């Protein structure tokens, strides 16, 4: 028996309508001394159900874990209605995870006909938002999990050990944000803080287009919840303008090269 541990995450699936795989995995996270990830089957589990969106919790790389390990976890998945901002269509259950049962969840999480209707609010601009809660209530067997992957409390937020220093710096710079976020959005606070920390700790040049997309999604979500994040919006706008200028410069260079090539081809005729 181990200590009671829980985690709550917001998983944003971008470009859902254009996914080229029948399986989508989230980033790996750690709770209860074990690594986990979320698994979505956009077209359902064809083994026994076809017309539902399926969602599961998995133990990745389970074949490398020592024999005898077990985890009992309470799992809750909630589809977010992006139009109303409400958390709805929730499924939850309690499962044992072990060597033979490494994937548990819901084959009929959401009916596809309803899910794929953009006016219903669950699929907006190709984006799907899922709130996942994993509560590990029993631990049998110790697994070799890096301490950097373990969660540590920082100002009331569970963050990775490797991020404690930078997250403390974030709260020192924006204390009002930390105090507002804690009581109002417990479901999203860990994911939002980690996302903000990653964005703010990077320079403009280090931000990928994927980083920008995730940051805009997080900003829109917390803004609907009532937060005024002018400082984040300002940085994202500046970054977006800078990235657009870079693209325009690249296009100019490309046009020049195309013109030179056309001139060369004309000369060779």
From Swiss-Prot:
It comes from the Eukaryota. Residues 6-134 form the MATH domain. This is MATH domain and coiled-coil domain-containing protein At2g01790. InterPro entries: MATH-CC_domain_protein (IPR050804), MATH/TRAF_dom (IPR002083), TRAF-like (IPR008974). The lineage of its organism: Eukaryota, Viridiplantae, Streptophyta, Embryophyta, Tracheophyta. Residues 228-269 form a coiled coil. Keywords: Coiled coil. Gene3D superfamilies: Apoptosis, Tumor Necrosis Factor Receptor Associated Protein 2, Chain A (2.60.210.10). SMART domains: MATH. It comes from Arabidopsis thaliana. The keyword Coiled coil applies.
């Amino acid at each position: 028996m181990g200590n009671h541990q829980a985690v709550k995450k917001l998983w944003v699936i971008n470009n859902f309508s254009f996914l080229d795989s029948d399986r989508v995995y989230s980033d790996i996270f750690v709770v209860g001394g074990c690594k986990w990830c979320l698994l979505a089957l956009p077209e359902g589990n064809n083994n026994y159900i076809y017309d539902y969106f399926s969602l599961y919790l998995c133990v990745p790389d389970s074949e490398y874990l020592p024999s005898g390990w077990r985890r009992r976890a309470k799992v809750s998945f909630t589809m977010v209605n992006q139009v109303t901002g409400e958390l709805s269509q929730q499924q939850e259950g309690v499962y044992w995870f072990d060597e033979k049962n490494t994937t548990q969840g819901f084959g009929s999480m959401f009916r596809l006909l309803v899910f794929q209707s953009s006016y219903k609010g669950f699929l907006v601009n190709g984006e799907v938002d899922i709130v996942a809660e994993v509560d590990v209530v029993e631990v049998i067997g110790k697994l070799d999990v890096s301490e950097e992957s373990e969660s540590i409390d920082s100002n009331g937020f569970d963050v990775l050990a490797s991020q404690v220093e930078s997250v403390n710096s974030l709260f020192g710079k924006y204390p009002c944000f930390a105090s507002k976020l804690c009581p109002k959005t417990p479901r999203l606070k860990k994911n939002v803080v980690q996302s903000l920390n990653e964005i703010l700790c990077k320079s403009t040049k280090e931000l990928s287009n994927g980083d920008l997309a995730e940051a805009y999604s997080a900003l829109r979500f917390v803004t609907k919840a009532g937060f005024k994040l002018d400082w984040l919006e300002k940085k994202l706008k500046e970054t977006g303008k800078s990235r657009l200028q870079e693209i325009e410069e690249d296009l100019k260079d490309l046009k020049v090269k195309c013109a030179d090539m056309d001139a060369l081809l004309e000369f060779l005729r």
